Amino acid sequence: VYTQTPRRQVNLSAFYLKPGQEWMTTLFLRRMMADDSVDYLDVTPSYSMREINRRIGFQDHSTGMVVVPTAAACWRPAGTCRLLALRDVPAGALSPAVMSLLARHHRLGCVALVVEMEGEYHPLILAATGRKGVAGVRVLLARDRALIRAVLGPLSRHLLGRGLFYLEYDAMAAPDDIPEALFWRRSSPVQMTRAPVGEAIDLTFSEFAFIPSPKLAVALKDLPQRAKHRVLRWSATDRISAYADPVTGVALQLAEYGIV
């Protein structure tokens, strides 16, 4: 979306390295990646594949995952940002190609929204994910991480109302301006053979959109109703307590509901 010149990209999500066969991998990948006009991407490399990728030209574009509890971030003000559903986007605000991209990801089960900020419109795509049975979303497409931070309040409220308890996105370091966020260094780094333009996150049509976890589907089945009847009906005192100590408050609520 954010590249000046459209390029072909090959995702190595289906590449499997059999233990004990590492010596063959480098030669195989070098032959497979002989076309310099193609960008190569690996968003879920195993520990052994990460080092092999680096040797053949991949660069790390993240060192961990920023994880933001939506129950803690939902108190943030909207500022000048506004979230729009696809049906509410004004005609001509985004190109037909971008609107088609959003619609196709929406049909795949992703959260597809448009952010209106200072008179400009930006696509935002999130894919369902899960950690230890807790449902959340991962950012697949955003102009940059600054846009995510700017819209974090209304976005967290939107997600929490749908039973999604955290938002995560890949990054090189923990953000200084999101104190409620955790930085998970054990997540796989995003590796690419070509540096992305600017600070954009673009993992559209990756395995996160096509292959959701089977366990996650079961966990998500009744979460919206549980969130509607429990999380969104906290008393004022409960809400203040959770805000004062977000991590503890959210953890206690999740434990109470039997989610963790």
Language-model regions: role of each:
Residues 54-140:
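Amide-forming acyltransferase catalytic core, primarily the GNAT-like/NAT-type
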Residues 97-98, 155, 227:
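Generic structural signal of hydrophobic/aromatic residues within well-ordered alpha-helices
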